[in-house]
């Protein structure tokens, strides 16, 4: 066999001509320590704060959280068990984004926007940064449209407007999540898209909640973001920002959205865990110094945009769990000072059967009053006064043996109004029904009934108005006011109904 040098030269020449010079420059580092959802890496000299990085061997994503002189502290978004010392980390040159848009409606996702409901992949056309700057004063307009929760005591006394931040605060098992879920259910047909963010909750509780929303037909306009108790602290920390970004898609497209953060106490605990593991200096209650900013930058993203900028709104309902009724602890006081009011739920009221267990004295809405419809304003004004007087007299009446008729009348009215404030879970009411029922309460139509019959009276009155006097409810809904004519019709209808009710059920 003879070797032909000419052929070898030809082959070499063709190979050299076809060679493309490619230099792949990547900023990489090496893992020097890993554990508890945190990794430290050497190298990555040009990485930016909050930039995403990838652990090459496992494909796991992390976020550069601490930039120190000789290493980078990374929070790991996912399972860190496969990551080992000496593994390579590379920069992704982008900050964290999540899929947004209508493709996420009806889905249950994790904080990275990946589906966890087994219904296949999500075809999102758009992505949004998880951390963005809140809209400035110039882009906003005052809150002027109501967000109806369907809960009488809230819509009448602590009204919420679209674009408001209203805190729901109370001990464990006092019905905080129930208020949030009823609010979501009540948005059906009202053009409000909802995002429910579960932070550090039991997966079984979230599954139960999702099935309730499906039953009520509310998942059609709702996205559920879950960072359960089984997920690591990094995912729990990211969750509310991811949920907010999903809600902001609707805000900046001129639509209305509602985001519920359940709950921010566990969020603060997750952030404290990350900060302590990264050796950031602890402050009060071992929380880091910037824990106020942690929540303020999240809640400031809720807004009502001016018409020039689309006129969308993002309403936030953060939830805080207190320990033994202590609303003066660090995180509760922080969030109270950030939000535009709070709904305070009290265990003693809850166990006494007053549900929703809202303490009217400690609850307040700082901007929602401007958003109330005129009809509700008319009935809520005297309702507030009647209940305040009743609560004042109630304590006094326990010690007094004989009461003058005026005091006795106020106590009688107050007891019936408090009974009227009770409401079943998963049964939100339309605002026109609330107006009719409260009108009957404040005008003394319940005063001569037994307290036990108040709820029955309410139920039958709504049925009567829907069946026989639907034009009254329609007028209140359309005019959003209680004109003299409508009021006269409502008065006559209640009187007619009451005489029938007393005949059948007695007083």
Swiss-Prot record:
It is found in: Cell inner membrane. Its EC number is 7.1.2.2. The keyword Kinase does not apply. Pfam families: ATP-synt_ab (PF00006), ATP-synt_ab_C (PF00306), ATP-synt_ab_N (PF02874). The record marks 363 as: Required for activity. One of its GO terms (cellular component) is proton-transporting ATP synthase complex. InterPro entries: ATP_synth_asu-like_sf, ATP_synth_asu_C, ATP_synth_asu_C_sf, ATP_synth_F1_a_nt-bd_dom, ATP_synth_F1_asu, ATPase_a/bsu_AS, ATPase_F1/V1/A1_a/bsu_N, ATPase_F1/V1/A1_a/bsu_N_sf. It is an enzyme of class 7 (translocase). GO terms for molecular function: ADP binding; ATP binding; proton-transporting ATP synthase activity, rotational mechanism. It catalyses: ATP + H2O + 4 H(+)(in) = ADP + phosphate + 5 H(+)(out). F-type ATPases have 2 components, CF(1) - the catalytic core - and CF(0) - the membrane proton channel. CF(1) has five subunits: alpha(3), beta(3), gamma(1), delta(1), epsilon(1). CF(0) has three main subunits: a(1), b(2) and c(9-12). The alpha and beta chains form an alternating ring which encloses part of the gamma chain. CF(1) is attached to CF(0) by a central stalk formed by the gamma and epsilon chains, while a peripheral stalk is formed by the delta and b chains. NCBIfam families: atpA, PRK13343.1. This is ATP synthase subunit alpha. It comes from Thermosipho africanus (strain TCF52B).
């Amino acid at each position: 066999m003879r070797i032909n040098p000419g052929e070898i030269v030809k082959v070499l020449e063709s190979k050299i001509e076809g060679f493309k010079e490619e230099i792949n420059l990547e900023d990489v580092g090496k893992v020097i320590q890993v554990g508890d959802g945190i990794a430290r890496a050497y190298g990555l000299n040009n990485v930016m704060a909050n930039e995403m990085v990838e652990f090459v061997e496992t494909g796991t994503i992390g976020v550069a959280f601490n930039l120190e002189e000789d290493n980078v502290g990374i929070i790991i978004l996912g399972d860190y068990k496969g990551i080992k010392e000496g593994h390579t980390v590379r920069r992704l040159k982008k900050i964290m984004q999540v899929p947004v848009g209508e493709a996420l409606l009806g889905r249950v996702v994790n904080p990275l926007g990946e589906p966890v409901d087994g219904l296949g992949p999500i075809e999102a056309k758009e992505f949004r940064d998880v951390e963005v700057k809140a809209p400035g004063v110039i882009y906003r307009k005052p809150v002027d449209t109501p967000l109806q929760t369907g809960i009488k005591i809230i819509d009448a006394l602590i009204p919420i407007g679209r674009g408001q931040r209203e805190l729901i605060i109370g001990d464990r098992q006092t019905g905080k999540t129930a208020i949030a879920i009823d609010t979501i259910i009540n948005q059906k047909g009202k053009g409000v898209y909802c995002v429910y963010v579960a932070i550090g909750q039991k997966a079984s509780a979230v599954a139960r909640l999702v099935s309730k929303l499906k039953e009520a037909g509310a998942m059609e306009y709702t996205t559920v973001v879950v960072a359960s108790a089984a997920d690591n602290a990094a995912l729990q920390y990211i969750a509310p920002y991811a949920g907010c970004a999903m809600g902001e898609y609707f805000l900046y497209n001129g639509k209305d959205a509602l985001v519920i953060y359940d709950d921010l106490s566990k969020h603060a605990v997750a952030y404290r865990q990350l900060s302590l593991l990264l050796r950031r200096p602890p402050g009060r209650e071992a929380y880091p110094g910037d824990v106020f900013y942690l929540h303020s930058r999240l809640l400031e993203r809720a807004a009502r945009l001016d018409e020039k900028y689309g006129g969308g709104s993002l309403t936030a309902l953060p939830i805080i769990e207190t320990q033994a009724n202590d609303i003066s602890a660090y995180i509760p006081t922080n969030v109270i000072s950030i939000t535009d009011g709070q709904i305070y739920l009290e265990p003693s009221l809850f166990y006494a059967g007053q549900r929703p267990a809202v303490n009217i004295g400690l609850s307040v809405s700082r901007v929602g009053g401007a958003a109330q419809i005129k009809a509700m304003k008319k009935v809520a004004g005297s309702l507030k006064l009647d209940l305040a007087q009743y609560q004042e007299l109630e304590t006094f009446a326990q010690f007094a043996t004989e009461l003058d008729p005026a005091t006795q009348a106020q106590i009688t009215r107050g007891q019936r109004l408090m009974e009227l404030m009770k409401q079943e879970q998963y049964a939100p009411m339309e605002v026109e029904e609330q107006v009719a029922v409260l009108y009957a309460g404040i005008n003394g139509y319940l005063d001569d009934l037994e307290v036990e019959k108040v709820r029955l009276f309410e139920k039958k009155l709504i049925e009567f108005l829907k069946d026989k006097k639907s034009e009254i409810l329609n007028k209140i809904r359309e005019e959003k006011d209680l004109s003299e004519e409508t009021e006269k019709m409502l008065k006559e209808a209640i009187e007619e109904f009451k005489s029938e009710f007393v005949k059948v059920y007695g007083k």
